[in-house]
Amino acid sequence: MSIKADRWIKRMAQEHGMIEPFVDGQVRGGVVSYGLSSYGYDIRIADEFKIFTNVNSAIIDPKNFDPRSFVDVKADVCIIPPNSFVLCRTIEYFRIPRNVLCVCVGKSTYARCGLIANVTPFEPGWEGYVTIEISNTTPLPAKIYANEGIAQVLFFEGDELPDVAYDDRSGKYQGQTGVTLPRI
């Protein structure tokens, strides 16, 4: 399994729609950077946020998730409460090839502020907008910015095709279009 370079990422995005919209090169200057990098792609977050709140004193249960645990916000910035988290989604829509696995890691700009981006791997054959969880590990409110970078996606090409890909097993998050809550 090898990591893929910018040339491959660009070709797959432009010829096969792997990333839409695709930004060829790094956008910087007054923003948290995003776009194509040497061995990855820095993704942006949309202006749709689900901010965790415990106003209903709910118990978090992934098998029976209560959507009232979140407050929906549509804005250019999102304030994450201290020691809490927010769910958001990417601006980019991904179509992952059958022989590729993607791993997503947070950007150091946010990590240095105590904000941690968590995303599970993008499995072979998966497509959709990526739901991202951003944790505020600090005792202070923290700000994140829509339409700017949040994490970097790394693309790994497998040595052979899997017997069963995500789309073959009708994965529960296949084709997700918005911020998606836990499903069983």
UniProtKB/Swiss-Prot annotation:
Q: Where does dCTP bind?
A: 107-112, 152, 166, 176
Q: Name one GO molecular function term.
A: dCTP deaminase activity
Which pathway does it serve?
Pyrimidine metabolism; dUMP biosynthesis; dUMP from dCTP (dUTP route): step 1/2
Q: List the disulfide bonds.
A: none
Q: Which domain of life is it from?
A: Bacteria
- InterPro entries in the cross-refs: dCTP_deaminase, dUTPase-like_sf, dUTPase_trimeric
Query: What EC number(s) are associated with this protein in UniProt?
Result: 3.5.4.13
Q: Which Gene3D superfamilies match?
A: 2.70.40.10
**Assembly and partners?**
Homotrimer.
Function of the protein? Catalyzes the deamination of dCTP to dUTP.
Recorded family membership: Belongs to the dCTP deaminase family.
| HAMAP family assigned | dCTP_deaminase
Name of this chain's protein: dCTP deaminase
- Organism per entry: Herpetosiphon aurantiacus (strain ATCC 23779 / DSM 785 / 114-95)
